[in-house]
A protein has these predicted regions:
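Acidic-residue sensor for enzyme active/binding pockets
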Residues: 13, 32, 70, 84, ...
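Extended aliphatic helical segments
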Residues: 7-10, 24-25, 64, 68, ...
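Acidic/glycine-rich phosphate/pyrophosphate-binding loops and surrounding catalytic core
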Residues: 83-141
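A positional/architectural concept
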Residues: 1-61
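Short, positively charged
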Residues: 40-90
Length: 141
């Protein structure tokens, strides 16, 4: 019997994913993390990006907008600021939000407003990269 790891992905909206996986790939703050069963315990922040949950030949693609990742030897818990299935991303809306953030950054002298616009820009770029990756793999048209 193959060894698996339980995965829970939750956000303020509720549970996004719950199930077993052979491997999880998460967008950690310092880079991507590959998590297998029996991984050493770890607690780290997440940056906006693609979360991949691999089970056999199937891969579930989610988009997380930051949060916290807790790893135990037999359990991965993602407490996301927000999360959605990657196939549910509205590409046109993400592109419009990216352009709006760029415009806000261009005309902003206030550091706090600039930082907020920059965070929004990074989120939308990560969303668009996720859509592009799914399209390249033939999972989106």
């Amino acid at each position: 019997m193959a060894m698996t790891i339980d995965v829970q992905v939750v956000s303020a909206e509720g549970s996004i994913y719950s199930g077993a996986a052979d491997m999880v790939v998460a967008p950690g703050e310092m880079g991507e993390l590959g998590i297998l069963p029996r991984h050493a315990p770890l607690l780290t922040g997440l940056r906006p990006g693609e979360l991949r949950i691999i089970h056999g030949a199937e891969t579930e693609y989610l988009f997380v907008n930051g949060g916290v990742l807790e790893i135990q030897p037999h359990l991965v818990t993602v407490l996301a600021d927000s999360a959605e299935r990657a196939t549910d991303i509205d590409e046109a809306k993400a592109m419009a939000a990216k352009q709006a953030a760029e415009a806000r950054m261009a005309g902003q002298a206030d550091r706090m407003e600039y930082a907020a616009a920059q965070a929004e820009l990074l989120e939308q770029i990560a969303r668009l990269k996720t859509v592009q990756r799914l399209r390249e793999q033939g999972l989106l048209r």
